């Protein structure tokens, strides 16, 4: 036989094989499309008038399951034959997951699938291959069986952990509201504390207050509502939508069943829940962008050394209150059109990047602001010829003071560890930082501020004097009554006051309603002050 005839013959032999593979794949795809899914049968009480009337979870779960089933059959045909020794169980699709060839007497493990809201993907599924090279059969049904029982086993430990996180959120946001309201009253009553920096603080404090109120309403009204929670595809989601973790574990969704349908989108509780979620997304975005405003202002004062009162706050107002409404509206419209679950709570959609993308950009920018600010602080401290250890101690203090204000913890710890112990530590750490962040910010930037403390002590002393005079016990005023602008001069040299007051020499002093000169507050005591200030 000539070489040419040999090549033609081999080519002709390949054609039937290629046709067989093409026909086989086409038949497989056709069967997947037309055959009913074995584990997600449509509920009998639903009509076939359209997909809109099918359960929302059924649509989401069925799509994921069909994708996994197609990939499994394709994998079964693509993988080479088993190369091990001895008996083994054949690769198979068990109806939910794909299993490779497994040696006899061994147990295969995989993470639980995410088809169902009550499945914990951190848990494991197991499938046993017996000594005869056959997959384990359940004694009751005599059918091959995979152990999915751990996927939705809500143990007492998980439930207790969920309740701890739930009450941690309630306590944290309640304390934050109380501390922030008290701080706002202090800044509003004592006019000698007024300056541009405090004005920015007030707006950021307001976003914390409103956001905490919305979250408390959500925890009290939405989380206990089983109809809303169980019919939404909920998954653990940690960062800014942190409360969903508690919601998912406290009210675990039911498996797909006949009553598991999408609620009426025009129902009052569904509409109110979506409005609440819209407000939460907006206030959360405002919170982070006011953090960005604080970072821009600090960077302008310290790095660019601009101490003038001419900074126009309207640009900060536009960035803090105006810009976040744009991604929030876009997210609401696209969510209603393309992923309209009951309360827009699901994290199983990339539409969340419309909200989280700008937030992450703001956090990253603030992170670089922090690094640059610390660099400038260290440079200034070196110029003062301080001891090296003390210099870095002050730099660390300055860094830790700025972290809760600028939200840097979300950049430093962006992902939850997969390890169970580390994951639990991460949960408690991040939930404490998130829920108590308003309390921490109010404490650091108001209650621990030296000038605020001096002002409050002076007011308390004046109150005691007036009280004594009212009851006839007149006392001579003590020398503890000092003016707020001069109080900074008595700060301890090893302290780190958050604000340093200075008066712009180019501008005349402006008297407020208490007859005192207004002051501007500059962060960090590393900025040199005029001795006569």
Swiss-Prot record:
Q: Which Gene3D superfamilies match?
A: GPCR, family 2, extracellular hormone receptor domain, Rhodopsin 7-helix transmembrane proteins
Q: Which domain of life is it from?
A: Eukaryota
Q: Which residues lie on this side of the membrane: Extracellular?
A: 42-163, 220-273, 335-350, 414-421
Under the heading PROSITE patterns, the entry gives: G_PROTEIN_RECEP_F2_1, G_PROTEIN_RECEP_F2_2, G_PROTEIN_RECEP_F2_3, G_PROTEIN_RECEP_F2_4
**InterPro entries (UniProt xref):** GPCR_2, GPCR_2-like_7TM, GPCR_2_calcitonin_rcpt, GPCR_2_calcitonin_rcpt_fam, GPCR_2_extracell_dom_sf, GPCR_2_extracellular_dom, GPCR_2_secretin-like, GPCR_2_secretin-like_CS
Disulfide bridge map = 72-98, 89-129, 112-151, 273-343
The record, for SMART domains, names:
HormR (SM00008)
GO CC annotations? acrosomal vesicle; amylin receptor complex 1; amylin receptor complex 2; amylin receptor complex 3; cilium
Sorted UniProt keywords: Cell membrane, Disulfide bond, G-protein coupled receptor, Glycoprotein, Membrane, Receptor, Signal, Transducer, Transmembrane, Transmembrane helix
* CDD domains in the record: 7tmB1_calcitonin_R (cd15274)
**Glycosylation-annotated residues:** 45, 90, 142, 147
A GO molecular function annotation here is:
amylin receptor activity
Q: Which SUPFAM superfamilies match?
A: Family A G protein-coupled receptor-like, Hormone receptor domain
Q: How does the annotation summarize its subunit structure?
A: Heterodimer of CALCR and RAMP1, RAMP2 or RAMP3; the receptor complexes function as AMYR1, AMYR2 and AMYR3 receptors, respectively, and respond to amylin/IAPP, calcitonin/CT and CGRP1 ligands. Interacts with GPRASP2.
Q: Family assignment? A: Belongs to the G-protein coupled receptor 2 family.
What role does it play? G protein-coupled receptor activated by ligand peptides amylin (IAPP), calcitonin (CT/CALCA) and calcitonin gene-related peptide type 1 (CGRP1/CALCA). CALCR interacts with receptor-activity-modifying proteins RAMP1, 2 and 3 to form receptor complexes AMYR1, 2 and 3, respectively. IAPP, CT and CGRP1 activate CALCR and AMYRs with distinct modes of receptor activation resulting in specific phenotypes. Ligand binding causes a conformation change that triggers signaling via guanine nucleotide-binding proteins (G proteins) and modulates the activity of downstream effectors.
Q: Mind telling me what this protein is named?
A: Calcitonin receptor
């Amino acid at each position: 036989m000539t070489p040419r005839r040999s090549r033609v013959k081999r080519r002709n032999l390949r054609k039937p094989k290629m046709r067989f593979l093409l026909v086989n794949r086409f038949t497989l795809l056709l069967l997947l499309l037309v055959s009913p899914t074995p584990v997600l049968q449509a509920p009998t009480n639903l009509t076939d008038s359209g997909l809109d009337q099918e359960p929302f979870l059924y649509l989401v779960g069925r799509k994921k399951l069909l994708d996994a089933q197609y990939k499994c059959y394709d994998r079964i045909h693509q993988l080479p034959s088993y190369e091990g020794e001895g008996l083994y169980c054949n690769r198979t699709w068990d109806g939910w997951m794909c299993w490779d060839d497994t040696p006899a007497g061994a147990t295969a493990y995989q993470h639980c699938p995410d088809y169902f809201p009550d499945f914990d993907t951190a848990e494991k599924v197991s499938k046993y291959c017996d000594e005869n090279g056959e997959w384990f059969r359940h004694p009751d049904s005599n059918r091959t069986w995979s152990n999915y029982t751990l996927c939705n086993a809500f143990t007492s430990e998980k439930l207790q952990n969920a309740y701890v996180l739930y009450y941690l959120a309630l306590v944290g946001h309640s304390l934050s509201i109380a501390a922030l309201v008290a701080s706002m009253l202090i800044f509003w009553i004592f006019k000698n504390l007024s300056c541009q920096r405090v004005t920015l603080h007030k707006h950021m404090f307001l976003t914390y207050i409103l956001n905490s109120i919305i979250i408390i309403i959500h925890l009290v009204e939405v989380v206990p509502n089983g109809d809303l929670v169980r019919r939404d595809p909920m998954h653990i989601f940690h960062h800014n939508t942190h409360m969903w973790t508690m919601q998912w574990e406290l009210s675990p969704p039911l498996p797909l069943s006949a009553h598991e349908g999408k609620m009426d989108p025009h129902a009052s509780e569904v509409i109110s829940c979506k409005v609440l979620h819209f407000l939460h997304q907006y206030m959360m975005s405002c919170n982070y962008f006011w953090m960005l405003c604080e970072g821009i202002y600090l960077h302008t004062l310290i790095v660019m050394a601009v101490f003038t009162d001419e900074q126009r706050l309207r640009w900060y107002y536009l960035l803090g209150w105006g810009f976040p409404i744009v991604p929030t509206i876009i997210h609401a419209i696209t969510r209603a059109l393309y992923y309209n679950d009951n309360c827009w709570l699901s994290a199983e959609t990339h539409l969340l990047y419309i909200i989280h993308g700008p937030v992450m950009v703001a956090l990253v920018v603030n992170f670089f602001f922090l690094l640059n600010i610390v660099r400038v602080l260290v440079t200034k401290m070196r110029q003062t010829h301080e001891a090296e250890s003390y210099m870095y101690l002050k730099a660390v203090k300055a860094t830790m003071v700025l972290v809760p204000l600028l939200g840097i913890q979300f950049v430093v710890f962006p992902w939850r560890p997969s390890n169970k112990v580390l994951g639990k530590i991460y949960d408690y750490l991040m939930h404490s930082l998130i829920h108590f962040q308003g309390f921490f910010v109010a404490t650091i930037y108001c209650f621990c501020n030296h000038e605020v403390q001096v002002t409050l002590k002076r007011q308390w002393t004046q109150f005691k004097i007036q009280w004594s005079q009212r009851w006839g016990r007149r006392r001579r005023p003590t020398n503890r009554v000092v003016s707020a602008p001069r109080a900074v001069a008595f700060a301890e040299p090893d302290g780190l006051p958050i604000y340093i007051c200075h008066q712009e020499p180019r501008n005349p002093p402006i008297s407020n309603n208490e007859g005192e000169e207004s002051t501007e507050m500059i962060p960090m005591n590393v900025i040199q002050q005029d001795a006569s200030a």
